[in-house]
Amino acid sequence: MILSKDIKLLPGSKVEVVIRVSKNVIQEKYNSLLQDYSSRLKIQGFRIGKVPINVIENKYSEGLKATVLEEVINNSFKEFFKEESKIPLSYATPTVKEKNLKLNLDKDFEFTFTYETYPEFKIPSFDEIDIKVEIPEVFIDDSDIDDEIKNLQIENSIIIEDEEGVVKEDSIVKVDFVELDDLSNEIVSTKRQGFVFTVGKSETYYDFDKDVIGMRINEERVIEKSYIADYKFEELAGSSRKLKIKIKSIKKRDLPLIDDEFAQDISDKYNTLDDLKNFIRSSLLNIVEEKKETLKLNKFFSTISEKLEIDIPHSMIEAEIEIAFKDAKRQNKNNMSLEEFKSIFYSSGYIGGDNLKDEILGNLKSKLIMQKMVDLDPIKVTESDVEDEMARQSKNLGVSYEEIKKFYEDQNLISYLKDDIKRERAKKKILENLKEVKGKKLNFRDFVNYKICE
């Protein structure tokens, strides 16, 4: 159907295509549609199938041409992308440039459309790169194990009334509070009732948890708070507020004893407290190894990204911004709208001290590099590879192999699983080709927060 096509690559991994369709094809489709109308159209004064062609054209010509135009464009898209290697991104629909296109049955039809495609770039071979990554020497001591035990102790505690009736560190307190104006009148919009928090452990909006220590049930207190210029909540930063707080209830955690019985209550796979501690130590060691692997991969991707010029399409950046926005929302890291989030990205790029733009573009480049490595992997994923991966997931998740297999087949996700297997291959290859340099000694807690760029 396509008589000719002219393809031009534009900045931003955008493709511009000029398509020409023969007038013979246009006329054939128009005449076919005209005959179809003629065979079933009902017009007053004529029998069905007997309406003269000229009458139909006089009445419906523009509508017929519009129908043919839509069909020609859609069929041109199908034919073009059936042969073209540069396909559109799934979230970037091809756009026809011309407005108000019309058919002229006596001329070849030409139209232009643009679309964004996957960016083209070449990854340097491992022979061309020499990446050294400094990995800290991590030690896990008894205090790290004790911290995890204490967390389990808190998780398995019960909340009871505090018979002393006095607020102290770690008390679980229910309060009513409200802001007061300069005349000590309540500002109704700030009133909150039944607010529950743990003293010294929770981040309250007004940061008053220390101010209620020593208060008793039903006691009311007016306090004044001054907030520093870079206070965590911008609305309060650099201001002073007067608050009226009333204690409604005071509770505490009844913590179980840490002994063999405690370990057995956590899981029947532990017979003694030492069994539980050994499991925790093993889990922390796994966390350390996973973190080390992440640091190495981050170093690889950041180094390769610096060497590459990747012309990332706008729609791909937009999609990555939305992913970052949803992640931040899920982690309660921002209360902005998507539009505000995008505005910051395209302007300063900073939220607080974090460079949002660098983080999002860095993550996106890492994904592109990894996908390129997956696409270039010449080794096919075999059925045996798929079965082994399903068996591994079955063991880790504690569900049957048949359930895992049924899930992937029912959700039509086998191809995604194969890509995941290739990604793991790529990660393994990266890790094998990095040179690890022993770094400074760090305890477990510091290492968990360690960044490769520090």
Curated annotation (Swiss-Prot):
Domain of life from the UniProt record: Bacteria
Location relative to the cell: Cytoplasm
A GO BP annotation: 'de novo' cotranslational protein folding
Gene Ontology MF term list: peptidyl-prolyl cis-trans isomerase activity; protein folding chaperone; ribosome binding
Record-level GO cellular component terms: cytoplasm
The entry's keywords: Cell cycle, Cell division, Chaperone, Cytoplasm, Isomerase, Rotamase
Catalytic activity: [protein]-peptidylproline (omega=180) = [protein]-peptidylproline (omega=0)
Coiled-coil intervals: none
EC number, as in UniProt: 5.2.1.8
Entry annotated with the keyword Cell cycle: yes
Pfam families named in the record: Trigger_C, Trigger_N
Residue span, PPIase FKBP-type domain: 170-256
Main location as per UniProt: cytoplasm
PANTHER family, alphabetized: TRIGGER FACTOR CHAPERONE AND PEPTIDYL-PROLYL CIS/TRANS ISOMERASE, TRIGGER FACTOR-LIKE PROTEIN TIG, CHLOROPLASTIC
UniProt similarity note: Belongs to the FKBP-type PPIase family. Tig subfamily.
HAMAP family noted in UniProt: Trigger_factor_Tig (MF_00303)
Domain topic, free-text comment: Consists of 3 domains; the N-terminus binds the ribosome, the middle domain has PPIase activity, while the C-terminus has intrinsic chaperone activity on its own.
UniProt function note: Involved in protein export. Acts as a chaperone by maintaining the newly synthesized protein in an open conformation. Functions as a peptidyl-prolyl cis-trans isomerase.
Name recorded for this polypeptide: Trigger factor
Species of origin: Borreliella burgdorferi (strain ATCC 35210 / DSM 4680 / CIP 102532 / B31)
Gene from which the chain derives: tig
